[in-house]
């Protein structure tokens, strides 16, 4: 499976590390060459310096052949636009990190689908799910009650 990840921040780097350990074909795109060099030296993945909203960068990353394009830069609009471009170039599935919870409303899903964004990630949802799951375990309840 070929996966292209746009954004070498905490989320993108974590995803790239995890997925590369699974033996998947990973390309990580970011503007910061120093970040990419540090990651490239330690993990089995390919890195590419550039903007995920530049057609040249997306074409060089061969998004037309990727099974999954994940945009997790710190900028919501960049994530949406890069997913839209990747989808138009042939990416099979696209996922964009967002900061606006309103975008998750069912009535807006069609808009994103029409733009080429298949799924949205709202990081705060993951945090709340993890907290809820932790509180269901006795060790977490005991820890929070003791504090």
Predicted regions and their residues:
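Cytosolic regulatory regions of ion transport systems
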Residues: 1-147
